[in-house]
Each structure stands twice: as structure tokens, then as C-alpha cells.
Amino acid sequence: MSSFSKEARQVHEALVKHGLENPFNMDPENGLLDAATRRSHIEKHITQIMELLNLDLRDDSLSKTPSRIASMYVDEIFLGLDYAHFPEITLIQNKMQVDEMITVHDISLSSTCEHHFASIDGKATVAYIPKDYIIGLSKINRVVQFFSQRPQVQERLTQQIILALQTLLATENVAVSIDATHYCVKARGICDRSSVTRTTSLRGLFKSSQNTRQEFLHIC
């Protein structure tokens, strides 16, 4: 059983309420198998897939591949499926009465397309206008990273980040923009090696105020 922090539970419940949570097969707090069991099952199935591809797992270059993939899935690229790994969030009272835009841009993100399990590489720009609280800047990067470490579609990823920050910061005034290269487009199918997909979500003043919106979009 995973153990959620209060902040993780609040974010998860907000995503469920708004229909933005990933399509989990069961409740992620009570239904998730422990990491060792998941690694064992995944390793077994990857072995079967490789054998169906006529690969000889006795070769020393391939023999540990199923184990490596299992560890990569559970402990690295899909770590965000387990809310036990939601970043620890420390809110700071806005004693300085900051009321201007705070922006973090060029946040590196790596995710995985849920349709083909191909890589997604991109950068995010996140901004918010504080009310009662501000948040450590690295926590914004960590929230982006957490939701990126899942099988994703970029549209949902953008909405998850913005709703998580709205929930944590208790403010509507949040904006998120992501530019990403999708290897399901670049390396297969159409094989377009230059296109970049942009998704943007604007809330609160970022949507209602033309000046605030233009300032954010200019940064992007």
C-alpha cells in the first residue's frame, strides 16, 4: 500500500473531480502492488515479448534487458504513477505581499506517450501570481517532473500541472505552457523529425487579463 501525503491526496482528489487523473485500473493508494512485485511481473512479460521478437536472451548484451526495463518502468520513467513519490511541498506565507507574476521557464521534461510508449522530450514554462502563499521554485520543477513520469498525453499533462499548482497554492492565477517533441511522430508513422507540439493552459488573471496573458505568452 502506498502512503499519500496530505498534499498528494488533495491533488489526486482534485484531478479525479475534474476528470484529469490518469486512467488507473484501481485506486492508486490502496490497489498498487509493491515495487518488487511489479518489477518481477514486468520482467517476466518483457522476457516473453523479447522472445516473441526472436531475440536470444542468452546473449550477454540482452540477458539483463528485461530486468533493466522493469526497473526503469517502476523506479524511473513511471515513478509518477505512485503518489507516494509526490514531491514534498513546503508552502511559505506571502509575508512580502508579492503580487506580480513568478515564472519558471525552460523546465526540462521527459515523458512517455501512452499510445505507443515512445519518448516525449520537451520544456515547460510555469507562472503564477501569489495570494496567501508562495512555493519554493524547485517544487514547481518537481511537480512538472512528477506528472511527466507517467504514460501521458501532452494535453492532460498540461492540465494536471496547472490544477496541481492551483490546488497547492490556493490560487486561480496559474499558467502552463509545454513545447515537446513526440517520438511517436518523429520516429514512426509520419516520421516528422522537426515538428514541435505546444499546449497552453491559462487560468485566473492569465486568462481574463489581456496584459497578463500577453506577458506570459511573450515569455513562452
UniProtKB/Swiss-Prot annotation:
Protein name according to UniProt: GTP cyclohydrolase 1
Q: Which family does it belong to?
A: Belongs to the GTP cyclohydrolase I family.
Subunit = Homomer.
One of its Pfam families is GTP_cyclohydroI
Biological processes, Gene Ontology terms: one-carbon metabolic process; tetrahydrobiopterin biosynthetic process; tetrahydrofolate biosynthetic process
Q: What class of enzyme is it?
A: hydrolase
Organism in which the protein naturally occurs: Hamiltonella defensa subsp. Acyrthosiphon pisum (strain 5AT)
Enzyme Commission code(s) on record:
3.5.4.16
Q: Name the UniProt key words of this record, in alphabetical order.
A: GTP-binding, Hydrolase, Metal-binding, Nucleotide-binding, One-carbon metabolism, Zinc
Q: In which pathway does it act?
A: Cofactor biosynthesis; 7,8-dihydroneopterin triphosphate biosynthesis; 7,8-dihydroneopterin triphosphate from GTP: step 1/1
Its gene is folE
Highest lineage ranks of the organism? Bacteria, Pseudomonadati, Pseudomonadota, Gammaproteobacteria, Enterobacterales
